[in-house]
């Protein structure tokens, strides 16, 4: 290595490392010219074992050989966490915005709950007020009137259950603007209830109407109107969006990961929330370590030329021509960076395949061991282990292979030792195979699979040129931003298809074999 390192007493050399060193020397001779003079002096301290097995700080797997890090931990002098005045200002702003969102959320819930309670109690009040105010003057309620009581009771129960299922659900997100259809429905219910109360106050309370059956029928009509409003709410809020009308493409700005979705008529803010719901289980987890090119490519310096004129003034034209020729020749030189990138990628793939094979073999052997222990436990009940103890017993045999594989694939920040133990315990408890255990680690999984501290974004920012309460249209583009990356969403309308019918008579499928002298039958 080019770095000045101090090796601990736990490091050792093996025959495999010598063969690996020969392979690495051949590769270094091929690219020695491009790498000379481009490396800076770095100081790396190798500490004795004593740190956690899966250290999140040691992610420099690309610069190590196959036996590096078996008993050591690399600690660099570079700080990965810093905070500035701008960060503090942004955090304060986020806290203020979250407080405003909480207030608006509670205000909307209070208004909706009050309106629902008013509309539910109004029919009951219509029937109770005459009994309380002028009970002696009311006409007797016959059989038909008593049957209306049953109708009102069941309709109110249906309305209560339907409203609870449709409106009183836990919100999935805080919207930056009011949900237009929900607000229109609330206004419609408010106007309906107020209109019924005005008519009830003028025509029934003031005149003290004695026809109690007519009053009950009036209350039944209000319940029927509320049921129709609830049906309208189901159509506008749930059924309208089911028919696909648009195709949206979601692209992550950093690594280019993309997905396509079909979606119906929704406002831009509701589409944004729907996309975020699908993002966490459709997109692979964002890993910024995979975005960097190899250091040999990034540190390569382009050669430059400086041309000085040392002659007289009359030689200025000649020197200018020579300098142009030199610069043109330098520009025609082919850059070998793609060769460097090719060899780096090939070496990385080779290392990943080798360490993957080691990990698979280690896990297979560990699971075979735990199955053998389970068979022995049936004979010796005194030595029975619970899943946690069994996971801890076999984890040591696969820990080194797991650590080196996660370092090579740059997945180490997303898998702690405790999370691996918990997953191993889960697999043992449910009698899962080694392949089922390795499924989480052999490739990047969806974002929701990892611990929320790794991916949780408290707030996303919706950036759109169109008002977010408008519905989707063809060509609409908006962005969902967070601190480290953003999701760019573009919209295309699903085209209209015109199909024509062409009838084919089954009797027309007749063929004739053409025989020639060379034809073999």
Curated annotation (Swiss-Prot):
The membrane-topology field of this record reads: Multi-pass membrane protein
> What ranges does the record list as Low complexity composition bias?
69-81
Membrane-crossing residues? 109-129, 148-168, 179-199, 219-239
- Function per UniProt: Has a role in non-canonical Wnt/planar cell polarity (PCP) signaling; can recruit dvl/dsh and prickle from the cytoplasm to the plasma membrane. Acts in a PCP complex to regulate the polarized assembly of fibronectrin on the surface of the mesoderm during gastrulation. Regulates convergent extension in both dorsal mesoderm and neural tissue without affecting cell fate. Regulates neural fold closure during neurulation. May be required for cell surface localization of fzd3 and fzd6 in the inner ear.
A Pfam family recorded for this sequence: Strabismus
- Which InterPro entries does this one have? VANGL
Per the similarity annotation, which family is this? Belongs to the Vang family.
The taxonomy runs:
Eukaryota, Metazoa, Chordata, Craniata, Vertebrata
Q: Which GO terms describe its cellular component?
A: plasma membrane
Keyword annotations from UniProtKB, A to Z:
Cell membrane, Developmental protein, Gastrulation, Membrane, Transmembrane, Transmembrane helix, Wnt signaling pathway
Region: Disordered, residue numbers: 1-81
Q: Which spans does this entry mark as compositional bias, Basic and acidic residues?
A: 57-67
Positions of short motif PDZ-binding = 518-521
Instruction: Give the Cytoplasmic membrane side ranges.
Output: 1-108, 169-178, 240-521
Provide the protein name: Vang-like protein 2
- Give the GO terms filed under biological process for this record: convergent extension involved in gastrulation; establishment of planar polarity; negative regulation of canonical Wnt signaling pathway; nervous system development; neural tube closure; Wnt signaling pathway
């Amino acid at each position: 290595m080019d770095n000045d390192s101090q090796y601990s007493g736990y490091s050792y050399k093996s025959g495999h490392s010598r063969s690996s060193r020969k392979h690495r020397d051949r590769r270094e001779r091929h690219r020695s010219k491009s790498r000379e003079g481009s490396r800076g002096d770095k100081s790396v301290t190798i500490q004795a074992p004593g740190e956690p097995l899966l250290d999140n700080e040691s992610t420099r797997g690309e610069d190590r050989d196959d036996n590096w890090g078996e008993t050591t931990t690399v600690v660099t002098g570079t700080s990965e966490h810093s905070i500035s005045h701008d960060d503090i200002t942004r955090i304060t702003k986020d806290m203020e915005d979250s407080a405003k969102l909480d207030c608006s959320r509670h205000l909307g819930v209070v208004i909706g709950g009050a309106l629902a309670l008013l509309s539910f109690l109004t029919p009951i009040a219509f029937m109770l007020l005459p009994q309380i105010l002028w009970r002696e003057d009311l006409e007797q309620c016959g059989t038909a009137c008593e049957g209306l009581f049953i109708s009102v009771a069941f309709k109110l129960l249906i309305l209560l259950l339907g409203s609870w299922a449709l409106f009183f659900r836990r919100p999935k997100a805080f919207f930056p603007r009011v949900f237009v259809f929900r607000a229109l429905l609330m206004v419609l219910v408010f106007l309906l209830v107020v209109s019924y109360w005005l008519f009830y106050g003028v025509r029934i309370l003031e005149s003290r109407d004695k026809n109690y059956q007519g009053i009950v029928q009036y209350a039944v009509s209000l319940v029927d109107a509320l049921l129709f409003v609830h049906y309208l709410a189901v159509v506008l809020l749930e059924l309208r969006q089911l028919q696909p009308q648009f195709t949206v493409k979601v692209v992550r700005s950093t690594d280019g990961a993309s997905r396509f979705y079909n979606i119906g008529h929704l406002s831009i803010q509701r589409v944004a929330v729907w996309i975020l719901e699908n993002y966490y289980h459709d997109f692979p987890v964002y890993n910024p370590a995979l975005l960097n090119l190899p250091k040999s490519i990034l540190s390569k310096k382009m050669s430059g030329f400086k041309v000085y004129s040392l002659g007289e003034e009359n030689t200025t034209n000649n020197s200018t021509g020579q300098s142009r020729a030199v610069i043109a020749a330098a520009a025609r030189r082919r850059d070998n960076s793609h060769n460097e990138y090719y060899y780096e990628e090939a070496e990385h793939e080779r290392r990943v395949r080798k360490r993957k094979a080691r990990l698979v073999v280690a896990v297979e052997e560990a699971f075979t061991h735990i199955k053998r222990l389970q068979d022995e436990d049936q004979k010796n009940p005194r030595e029975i282990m619970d899943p946690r103890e069994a996971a801890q017993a076999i984890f040591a045999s696969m820990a080194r292979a797991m650590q080196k594989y996660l370092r090579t694939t740059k997945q180490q920040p997303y898998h702690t030792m405790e999370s691996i133990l918990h997953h191993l315990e889960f697999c043992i408890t449910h009698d899962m195979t080694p392949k089922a255990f390795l499924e989480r680690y052999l490739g990047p999984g969806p974002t929701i699979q990892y611990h929320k501290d790794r991916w949780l974004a408290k707030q996303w920012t919706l950036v759109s040129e169109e008002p977010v309460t408008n519905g989707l249209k063809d060509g609409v583009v908006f962005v969902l931003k967070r601190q480290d990356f953003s999701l760019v969403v573009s919209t295309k309308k699903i085209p209209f298809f015109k199909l024509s019918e062409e009838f084919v008579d089954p009797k027309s499928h007749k063929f004739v074999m053409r025989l020639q002298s060379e034809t073999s039958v």
